[in-house]
Amino acid sequence: MPTRRPRVTDSGFASAGGQRLDTALAARGLARSRTSAAQLIASGLVTVDGRSALKPSLRVRTEQLIEVASSDHYVSRAAHKLIAALDAFPVTVAGRTALDVGASTGGFTQVLLERGAVAVIALDVGHEQLAPSVRADERVVVVEGVNARYLTRESLQALAPAAAASDLVVADLSFISLALVLPALVETVGLDADFVVLIKPQFEVGRGGIREGLVTDHALREDAVSGVLWSAWDLGLPTAGVLSSPLAGSAGNCEYLAWFSTAAGSNPTEWSEQVSAIVRA
């Protein structure tokens, strides 16, 4: 009796066994959700083992390589997180001097430049991470090897005199709680600045709340977001906006963006229902 061969899709992939492609994309942190994964697939941006994959239902195995092609010119996928925030929050960038904390390769910095910032201080604890194309922009002032937790107005201005005019702060930090960094940022730029920060629950909850690198408990994620909002409030920064990041973190963690502004914000209590809805969506 002849051996039954696995069914082959119209893309030429054997589809027996394995996990759905859209599910795998979300599980591997390559897409925010199965819905966004399906959009990436439909756009022709996804390949499996180097071959174009056009169906969300395609079955893939753990050992197969899934890649999402870059569909734009940004130096990092983090750029799309800040774009989502600036599209949702009425934060003016044009004509302002911005401080990008945790600049890394420069995705946030790149977005700020494209939106008309007159100067961006790209600060990071690491060295030589900023993409050459971003570093080459004359409006960028690179500050490397500086831990934002210990930043002061004087120390930053000594390294970057242009920072004296900073009135917009964006932050994308890893391996440290925002609650530990916000006090230094407020002291450095003052309360009149707008703050747009990326909240990563995996760095806000304790180790006990993380399973295989992920914060899967909705209550813990909600506590993480609320905790950052209250930390900002205690420093004199009201909450003016909260949203879910359009992209998951590199390990698949859900992330969130918050806007703090003394001119437009309010007590975090007024945001509790929205935070809960966003986290549990």
Label every PLM stretch briefly:
Residues R7-Q64:
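A basic, amphipathic helix-loop patch mediating RNA/tRNA/ribosome contacts
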Residues V93-S104, L112:
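Conserved class I S-adenosyl-L-methionine
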Residues S104-T109, G126:
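Residues at the N-terminus of the alpha-helix immediately C-terminal to the conserved SAM/SAH-binding loop
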Residues V111-A119:
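Conserved S-adenosyl-L-methionine
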Residues I121-L180:
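S-adenosyl-L-methionine
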Residues A179-V196:
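A short glycine-rich, Lys/Arg-flanked "PGG" loop and its adjoining helix->strand segment in the class I
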Residues P201-D217:
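Short, glycine-/aromatic-enriched active-site segment of Class I SAM-dependent methyltransferases
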Residues C254, S261-A281:
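Flexible, glycine-/basic-rich loop-and-beta segments that form/coincide
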